[in-house]
């Protein structure tokens, strides 16, 4: 299908194809696997933990504003997620301890206990981006999304079961109440969700 539209996209200078074993490499594309194989790792860039990320939010007032977070505070909160799951986590505010996290994540992988997080809220929302995406990925886990725009509690609960999600990220009552209503409705019909 890319061949059909490529001529209509003259500003695209480089095409990279990720092989999925089903289609041959398009003649004008580069193989992603070849690029990765031929590339070498970039040197590690040390970042200052006080570097700031700003996201925009309406918050509780509905008025847009910027909220600033430091990278260091994110590292602490991300690994706090491991502690909440019952793992013994070193104090990561001491940079020397961060390397101690690697064996924890390797053990989680070995025991098939890495997080599988269903992100129910938008990824553009701080909760979806940070708690759902960044935290899960930084701990070696997988994120799960649904292929439909909008909040559909039945779809979410079915996705939890079919994708074997271990957690779901939501934002407040706007998500919790409809999901709880669906759980209650299913239970009242003697057909509770098996999650």
Explain the meaning of each model-derived region.
Residues 1-5, 20-23, 121, 165-195:
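Adenylate-forming
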Residues 29-30, 68, 169:
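Short aromatic/basic micro-patch
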């Amino acid at each position: 299908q890319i061949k059909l539209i490529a001529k209509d996209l003259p500003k695209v200078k480089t095409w990279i194809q990720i092989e999925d074993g089903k289609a041959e490499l398009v003649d004008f594309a580069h193989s992603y696997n070849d690029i990765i194989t031929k590339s070498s790792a970039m040197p590690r860039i040390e970042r200052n933990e006080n570097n700031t990320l700003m996201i925009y939010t309406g918050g509780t007032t509905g008025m847009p504003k910027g909220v600033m977070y430091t990278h260091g505070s994110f590292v602490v909160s991300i690994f706090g997620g491991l502690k909440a799951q019952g793992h013994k986590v070193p104090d990561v505010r001491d940079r020397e301890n961060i390397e101690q996290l690697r064996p924890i994540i390797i053990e989680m992988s070995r025991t098939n206990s890495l997080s599988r997080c269903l992100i129910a809220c938008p990824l553009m929302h701080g909760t979806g981006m940070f708690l759902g995406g960044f935290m899960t990925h930084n701990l070696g886990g997988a994120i799960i999304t649904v292929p439909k725009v909008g909040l559909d509690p039945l779809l979410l609960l079915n996705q939890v079961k079919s994708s074997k999600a271990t957690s779901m990220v939501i934002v407040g009552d706007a998500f919790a109440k409809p999901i709880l209503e669906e759980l209650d409705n299913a239970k009242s019909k003697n057909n509770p969700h098996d999650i």
